[in-house]
């Protein structure tokens, strides 16, 4: 199976649609005008011909999404267990057709569930409440991060949201190197999908993506903590707050969770020993 770059385009407007809208400003109701609206499409992840999940997502960087989802959901342990991917149009949406190793495919069939997502719902398709949450090996304490370098990352986070700049409708996830520089990032209408894209990209990049932390433009849910931990990410920064379950999961799996990240301040929820404050 050939690994195609279906999602690579030359213009960000390929991921937006012009719609006629009415703009209201105080004491002024303006006539209908054209504005950009972010695209959101159903994306099916199909493993060895069997559809496993349908998620609502932005139609770009989908091979990174498929790789990140496969890793963060425990379908694979290594990118080498995926032999190839094709992104193809399907009825009213897109399919990522994934060639999965036989051993991993047998495991997937054994625990397969009907998971229908709404921009990345972690509970959709889970049959019992006891099934929520996956066992995650406690993370090592091999990383540190100087909080004095976080401001640089925050300043440039929206550089990875070209669609968001046009529409105000996407979340971002980026990889922060210890220097505070951003190695790369992705955007999506779904915050979990944006993170999966980042995790998939990280798994196939070089050594510079091994050190550092993940930064998301949204709140931190338990699933985002769990996905990060499943992929070996030790530090997760979020621009907004964390939920109680996210904090509990982060505490159990030794992940350093930091929320309300703003220039010059942050709220450290768990495992502050990885952080250096100048």
Swiss-Prot record:
Superkingdom in the source lineage: Bacteria
Active site: 121 (cysteine persulfide intermediate)
Subcellular location: Cytoplasm
Residues reported in the UniProt entry to bind Mo-bis(molybdopterin guanine dinucleotide): 260-265
Xref: SUPFAM superfamilies: Cytidine deaminase-like
Key words of the record: Cytoplasm, Molybdenum cofactor biosynthesis
GO MF annotation: an example: sulfurtransferase activity
Annotated GO CC locations: cytoplasm
Pfam families recorded: FdhD-NarQ
UniProt keyword Cytoplasm, yes or no: yes
A GO BP annotation: Mo-molybdopterin cofactor biosynthetic process
Keyword Metal-binding set for record: no
UniProt-listed Gene3D superfamilies: 3.10.20.10, Cytidine Deaminase, domain 2
Range of residues in the leader sequence: none
Protein role: Required for formate dehydrogenase (FDH) activity. Acts as a sulfur carrier protein that transfers sulfur from IscS to the molybdenum cofactor prior to its insertion into FDH.
Family: Belongs to the FdhD family.
The name this protein goes by in its record: Sulfur carrier protein FdhD
Organism: Salmonella paratyphi C (strain RKS4594)
């Amino acid at each position: 199976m050939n690994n195609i770059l279906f999602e690579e385009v030359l213009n960000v407007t390929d991921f937006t649609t012009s719609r006629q809208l009415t703009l209201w400003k105080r004491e002024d109701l303006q006539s209908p005008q054209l504005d950009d609206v972010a695209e959101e499409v159903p994306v099916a992840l199909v493993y060895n011909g069997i559809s496993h999940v349908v998620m609502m997502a932005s139609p770009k960087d989908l091979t990174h999404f498929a790789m990140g989802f496969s890793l963060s959901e425990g379908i694979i342990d290594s990118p080498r267990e995926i032999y190839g991917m094709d992104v193809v149009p399907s009825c009213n949406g897109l399919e990522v057709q994934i060639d999965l190793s036989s051993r991993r495919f047998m495991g997937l069939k054994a625990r397969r569930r009907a998971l229908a997502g709404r921009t990345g719902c972690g509970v959709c398709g889970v049959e019992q409440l006891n099934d929520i949450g996956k066992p995650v090996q406690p993370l090592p304490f091999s990383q540190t991060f100087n909080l004095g370098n976080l401001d640089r990352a925050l300043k440039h986070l929206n550089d990875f949201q070209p669609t968001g700049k046009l529409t105000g409708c996407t979340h971002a996830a980026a990889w922060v190197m210890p220097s505070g520089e951003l190695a790369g990032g992705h955007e999506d209408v779904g915050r979990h999908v944006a993170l999966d894209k980042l995790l998939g990209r990280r798994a196939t990049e070089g050594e510079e993506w091994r050190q550092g932390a993940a930064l998301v433009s949204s709140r931190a849910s338990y699933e985002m903590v769990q996905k990060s931990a499943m992929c070996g990410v030790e530090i997760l920064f979020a621009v907004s707050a964390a939920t109680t379950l996210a904090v509990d999961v982060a505490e159990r799996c030794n992940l350093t969770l930091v929320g309300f990240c703003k220039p010059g301040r942050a709220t450290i929820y768990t495992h502050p020993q990885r952080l250096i404050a100048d």
